[in-house]
């Protein structure tokens, strides 16, 4: 990372951190390193991205120390040149109460589905001058299966391209005339669930047992009861169930849950 930063067109000089101090007490060492970066790149601002930020909760519990969160709070309060971007699958309301003490100056932004027009454009024109490889029925089926969830749209499209390329190689077909069909989309669903297993598994793992029980009952054909109101509200907010609470928002997610239940 350090060498790559120095090769950027707009060069960023990242000093090497003290490996010994990092091993002994990592978070104070990281604070010192970030200060060194500021001194070495005067006049610049920095974006620090923390993906799956909720994993820090596991570190706090495993070490019985809130050092990671103290590090974040220190950075937010005392390093104005740094912008922190947290991303994850859990809302702040789902984390332990003490998190709010450390993220006072943050702002929450919900990342949701693409607009259908945006998803269609992503499918048909992912890069400039992309050859049209989809029949309209295939595009419609991708939209239906993913409900325009951006990661799933791209995952399905990637697997479709792999399928078409494999067919072209095996049958010596013409790449300019081969197009994906709705049937092709259905064919790759098992592969999509396998390749995207980390996404689906994390989604399932983030659910409480009461959430999972309701999904099991829905798969079995039952409908929510008044006692399920709180769980339904939560699963709607997490974009798993529709507002009526009796159907999945994303068919691919439903297929994964069905697969999980079959394996139980």
Explain the meaning of each model-derived region.
Residues 133-136, 144, 148-238:
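Winged-helix-like regulatory helical subdomains adjacent to P-loop NTPase cores
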Residues 21-32, 67, 141, 155, ...:
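Amphipathic alpha-helical interaction segments
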Residues 1, 65-69, 108, 139:
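Amphipathic alpha-helical segments in well-structured domains
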Residues 92-144, 165-168:
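Helix-loop-helix "sensor" segment of P-loop NTPases
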Residues 55, 59-99:
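Sensor-1/coupling segment of RecA-like P-loop NTPase cores
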Residues 3-50, 54-56, 67-79:
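Mid-core helix/loop region of P-loop NTP-binding domains shared across ATPases and GTPases
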Residues 149, 192-193, 208, 240-264:
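Short capping/hinge segments at domain boundaries that bridge a core fold to an adjacent linker or tail
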Residues 55, 89-94, 114-119, 160, ...:
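Conserved nucleotide-binding/hydrolysis micro-motifs of P-loop NTPases
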